[in-house]
């Protein structure tokens, strides 16, 4: 279930004759002056006295709110074609949109990687491409360090989704599994989406085979082969959370 924190809020619902200068209610003060002068038979706004002054007084109330941070991670290596990125972008867009409906506040962190990972802007996340090999664990490591430092689990519901074609350095697959198991101690949910475009190899990657050994109810995987699989991926990733049908 979603973690809730108690937030302090203020509402100015009352007016009093004494208060802080910065809380002076000019409109109510003018009305009091006008009312007093009319009762004296001297209508108009003039001759201000202390008894005319009205100040806004804050009422404090507390609200239980839910906050979420979403880590979206994408493989930037040369094998991630424009078509594969399009599928990843579509899933990411709807993930963020749904979570913004569920939570009071949602922050999104974009992480891109080839053999090394970095936090990037949304524009770069979807627009840039890099060459070279792929070391997916670099992204999971950056996300783990970042959430521990900036988004404590006592205050945030942390979601993480990673999209790759699974063409990972072979000896890194076990490291990925270990990093995900670490992240599951910090995250509300971790998801891995493997993108297999129509003309690429359709068999699941060695990375996905390694990740299938993670037996955890909050770790989900799916394979996307065409744009038509986007809805199925959303059901796999979000159905239990927000009733995607």
Q: What name fits each language-model region?
A:
Residues 1-66:
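Acidic/polar low-complexity segments with low predicted structural confidence
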Residues 21, 29, 49, 57-71, ...:
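Acidic, glycine-rich A-domain
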């Amino acid at each position: 279930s979603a973690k809730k924190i108690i937030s302090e809020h203020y509402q100015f619902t009352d007016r009093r004759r004494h208060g802080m200068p910065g809380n002076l209610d000019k409109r109510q003060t003018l009305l009091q002056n006008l009312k007093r002068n009319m009762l004296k038979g001297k209508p108009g706004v003039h001759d201000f006295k202390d008894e005319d002054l009205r100040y806004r007084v804050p009422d404090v109330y507390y609200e239980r709110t839910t906050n979420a941070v979403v880590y979206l991670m994408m493989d930037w290596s040369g094998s991630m074609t424009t078509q594969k990125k399009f599928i990843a972008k579509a899933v990411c867009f709807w993930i963020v949109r749904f979570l913004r409906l569920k939570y009071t506040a949602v922050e999104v962190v974009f992480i891109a990687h080839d053999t090394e990972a970095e936090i990037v802007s949304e524009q770069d996340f979807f627009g840039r491409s890099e060459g070279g090999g792929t070391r997916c664990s670099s992204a999971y490591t950056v996300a783990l360090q970042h959430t521990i430092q900036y988004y404590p689990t006592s205050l945030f519901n942390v979601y993480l989704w990673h999209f790759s074609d699974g063409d990972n350095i072979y000896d890194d697959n076990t490291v990925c599994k270990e990093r995900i198991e670490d992240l599951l101690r910090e995250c509300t949910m971790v998801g891995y989406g493997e993108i297999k475009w129509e003309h690429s190899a359709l068999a699941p990657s060695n990375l996905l085979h390694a990740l299938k050994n993670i037996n955890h109810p909050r770790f989900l995987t799916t394979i996307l082969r065409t744009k038509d699989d986007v809805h199925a991926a959303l059901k796999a990733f979000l159905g239990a959370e927000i009733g995607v049908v």
